[in-house]
Amino acid sequence: MNVLVVGGGGREHALCWALRRDAASAFSEDLTLFAAPGNPGTAALATNLPIPATAVDHLVAAALRHEIDVTIIGPEAPLAAGLADRLRKAGRTAFGPSAAAARLESSKAYSKEVMRRAGVPTAASATFVEETPMLDYIATHAEPVVVKASGLAAGKGAVVCKTRAEAAAVARAMLAGSLGEAGKEIVIEEFLEGEELSVLALTDGERLVILPPAQDHKRLGEGDTGPNTGGMGAYCPVGIATTSLLARVRAEVFEPVLREVAAQGSPYEGVLYAGLMILPDGTPSVLEFNARFGDPETQVLLPALLPGFSEHLVAIAQRRWNPLATQQMLSVERAAVTTVLAARGYPDNPEKGAAIRLPDPAELGDDVIVFHAGTYRDNEGKLRASGGRVLSVTGLGQTVALAAHASRAAAERIAFEGKTWRRDVAWREIQRAGAA
């Protein structure tokens, strides 16, 4: 079987890692793995193809040339650009939603409208494309104010503003082009307090299976301070994700949204990620939808699961999925914590080119996996940072606390100039365990 993973980040390295791990037991034939564009981490597991993840025409041509059986699309941009549609039209099989269904992520305004029509709990909001009515709305809004670019902004398009004045300035800048096309439409939203939870579901458009939830750490600094990022760490399992809560998430979030997009003629196929705020009264409220696996959530979810999970992604793509079989293998084998190591200046102006000293895997131990994201090799073969989020360091353990210790100990041993990271990933779960 020939499989292509599209993307070059930590999520895609984790997907390649899982596919390679599962190859012997889950697939009935030999696995030939490709990544486009991949990174130095995927190069050890797959053949990297030097094709950008957004080069749809070239990716389709590569899928035909290499006789790819299944393409697993990692990032949001190629989904929004219609890569899954184009592959299917060319007679290839793809894991990922159509461009129309992927609007749940690529347009926050559309996502809000879908939730309104489906009766899904979410923060009150209003959408604007013109400055004057937007500023008038902000002027009477309760503080804090959440300002979101409607389009794709690499996880950095949502800003929690303490004051109306700050919100007005941020919204005006977005509308003026600070985030490019992503900010041409602005969503102004009420601020919700509670605890965030990342819940992902596999679906073929009709049936769904909820995966073990994770908790992301969006803020750059320890203690959840600083600007929003694409994610500075994550952990799994999460204590607040009880069976009863997940039953509510299924009934109140996933099922009505899937029905609504199907009714609009855009059935959703692939993985749907619900970024939730669990309110103090236990109500799950949707902050956002993503049309793909989360990053860095994937880097904890896949190592935590029993081997064999990736075959179920292939089964969905090939329209032969058995949800019951997926549900039966979803027990979390071990806790997992990933710590993201970012470049200095991230997220606004990350530095590039720092040389990375990465110990051999044997030195880090069997309970640590390092996933590459923003890395490359120079002309001499030296590993360097290409900016942004550079590495995800995943630790495994019988408890979240032990997994966090393994992750942090390994992160300490990885060196590059300007290394920026949080030493408190999973602090809520560790605090909960200590209070129990």
Locate the predicted segments by residue.
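ATP-binding N-terminal substructure of ATP-dependent carboxylate-amine bond-forming enzymes
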Residues: 1-100
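Solvent-exposed alpha-helices and their adjacent loops that cap or buttress functional pockets
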Residues: 26-27, 41-42, 65, 95, ...
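Short acidic-hydrophobic, aromatic-tinged amphipathic segments that line or gate anion-handling sites
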Residues: 48-55, 126-130, 161
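A conserved helix-loop-beta module that forms one wall/lid of the active-site cleft
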Residues: 95-157
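Internal nucleotide-binding/catalytic subdomain
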Residues: 157-302
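Active-site "cap" helix and flanking loop/linker of ATP-utilizing ligase/carboxylase catalytic domains
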Residues: 250-272, 290-367, 378
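Generic C-terminus detector
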Residues: 375-380, 384-436
